[in-house]
Amino acid sequence: SVFEVKNETIERYRQEVAALQERGVVIQSIICDGKSGLLDLFLDIPVQMCQFHQVKIIVRHLTRKPKSPAAQALRALSLTLTESTQAAFEAALARWYEQYAVFLNERSVNEKTGHSHYTHKRLRAAYNSLKRHLPWLFTCECFPELCIPNATNLLEGKFSEMKQLL
């Protein structure tokens, strides 16, 4: 049966995967967009975060034309994600951090309150997103026998076709 899901929730994903498994469906892997809480929900199933969605997250934080050299370099690095291996990407991200750590960790003081805060919040958010998602960005490399795609693009194209048929 087909039904429309109004709101995607982590609990809904858990229920639907369990329902599929109860029907005897063997789920070899899950490819997702990085929805908070979803990446570490299925500990017994390989989960690949869509690399394209990760790039979109970076662009959302940094814009398409970032101003600072650090943000420009991080955006450029993120654009190599889909062509990189895990080892190469992690090494490049570590080099980026070495070069820009001081800038990334700069703090400013609010003159009214006297409290300090990170000066480059959006850059930190972009970098932290990459660091946080690294364990799931290259799952496809860890399980070559499963032929896991690195992005959801193929799936989203199929969903568009199905929606037109409904």
Where do the model's predicted regions map?
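Acidic/histidine-rich catalytic cores and adjacent linkers
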Residues: 22-42, 75-166
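Surface-exposed beta-strand edges and their flanking turn/coil or helix-capping segments
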Residues: 14-18, 62-65, 73, 153
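Active-site beta-loop-alpha junctions of metal-dependent nucleic acid enzymes
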Residues: 2-25, 29
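Conserved beta-strand -> loop -> alpha-helix junction used to position metal-binding or nucleic-acid-contacting
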Residues: 29-75
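Short, amphipathic alpha-helical segments
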Residues: 7-11, 32, 49-52, 83, ...
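Short, flexible loop/turn elements at secondary-structure junctions
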Residues: 4-7, 34, 56, 159
